């Protein structure tokens, strides 16, 4: 298995991303010595991990940007034939305990989304995994309006959590950012604050970007 070294500069990262554009996942996997799964039912994170490997991402599962030394987060985004994202985009795990004093400026959501390299990938299920092509990468930073929308949603969601109302939050809350259960196993539990101030158990939650938000990013970049 080949393991590319981390890029030493932003230009090098963008060059690597540009060289991937137009390749199939099968071609990329062959170059890295990776087997290609027949489907992604048991390998949901496989595409993201493949792209991370090719570009030399360093974070792994740590709560930091994928290219911390460059200040860049990497996000693969599955799209349909018209270029629309097929699913929401995972950002990070949501803190359900010890939230007192936590501010937007210090939040992991803000840190992760300060600068993102988006890599679109064909995602429609009728295309075999190996044949799905990689699109042109986009280096994106949120506009002041996008930052304000993200902050407002984050602060409202965190207020629910701090008041012990995490169970009342649904994926419908938030204009651009939503909170959803984040666990491969529905039986997984983590501690949370309850409405009466005691500590209870609930499913781990994660922050996700809603589809219209990421679709707007792609539209702005590709002018469609």
From Swiss-Prot:
<dbReference type="InterPro" id="IPR011335">
    <property type="entry name" value="Restrct_endonuc-II-like"/>
</dbReference>
<dbReference type="InterPro" id="IPR011337">
    <property type="entry name" value="DNA_rep_MutH/RE_typeII_Sau3AI"/>
</dbReference>
<keyword id="KW-0378">Hydrolase</keyword>
<keyword id="KW-0227">DNA damage</keyword>
<dbReference type="InterPro" id="IPR037057">
    <property type="entry name" value="DNA_rep_MutH/T2_RE_sf"/>
</dbReference>
<comment type="similarity">
    <text>Belongs to the MutH family.</text>
</comment>
<keyword id="KW-0234">DNA repair</keyword>
<dbReference type="InterPro" id="IPR004230">
    <property type="entry name" value="DNA_mismatch_repair_MutH"/>
</dbReference>
<protein>
    <recommendedName>
        <fullName>DNA mismatch repair protein MutH</fullName>
    </recommendedName>
</protein>
<keyword id="KW-0540">Nuclease</keyword>
<dbReference type="GO" id="GO:0005737">
    <property type="term" value="C:cytoplasm"/>
</dbReference>
<dbReference type="GO" id="GO:0006304">
    <property type="term" value="P:DNA modification"/>
</dbReference>
<keyword id="KW-0963">Cytoplasm</keyword>
<dbReference type="GO" id="GO:0003677">
    <property type="term" value="F:DNA binding"/>
</dbReference>
<keyword id="KW-0255">Endonuclease</keyword>
<comment type="function">
    <text>Sequence-specific endonuclease that cleaves unmethylated GATC sequences. It is involved in DNA mismatch repair.</text>
</comment>
<dbReference type="Pfam" id="PF02976">
    <property type="entry name" value="MutH"/>
</dbReference>
<dbReference type="GO" id="GO:0006298">
    <property type="term" value="P:mismatch repair"/>
</dbReference>
<dbReference type="GO" id="GO:0004519">
    <property type="term" value="F:endonuclease activity"/>
</dbReference>
């Amino acid at each position: 298995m080949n393991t590319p070294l981390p890029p030493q500069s932003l230009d090098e990262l963008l060059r690597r991303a540009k060289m991937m554009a137009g390749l199939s996942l099968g071609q990329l996997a062959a170059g890295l010595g990776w087997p290609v799964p027949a489907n992604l039912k048991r390998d949901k994170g496989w595409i993201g991990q493949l792209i991370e490997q090719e570009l030399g991402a360093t974070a792994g599962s740590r709560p930091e940007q994928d290219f911390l030394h460059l200040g860049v987060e990497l996000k693969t985004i599955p799209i349909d034939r018209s270029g629309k994202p097929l699913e929401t985009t995972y950002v990070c795990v949501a803190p359900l305990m010890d939230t007192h004093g936590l501010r937007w400026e210090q939040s992991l959501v803000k840190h992760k989304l300060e600068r993102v390299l988006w890599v679109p990938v064909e995602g429609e299920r009728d295309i075999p995994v190996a044949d799905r092509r990689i699109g042109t990468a986009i280096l994106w930073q949120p506009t002041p309006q996008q930052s304000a929308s993200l902050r407002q949603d984050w602060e409202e969601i965190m207020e629910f959590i701090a008041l012990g109302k995490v169970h009342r939050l649904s994926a419908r809350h938030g204009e651009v950012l939503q909170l959803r259960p984040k666990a491969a196993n529905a039986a997984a539990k983590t501690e949370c604050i309850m409405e009466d101030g005691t500590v209870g158990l609930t499913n781990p939650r994660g922050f996700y970007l809603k589809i219209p938000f990421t679709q707007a990013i792609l539209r702005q970049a590709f002018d469609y």
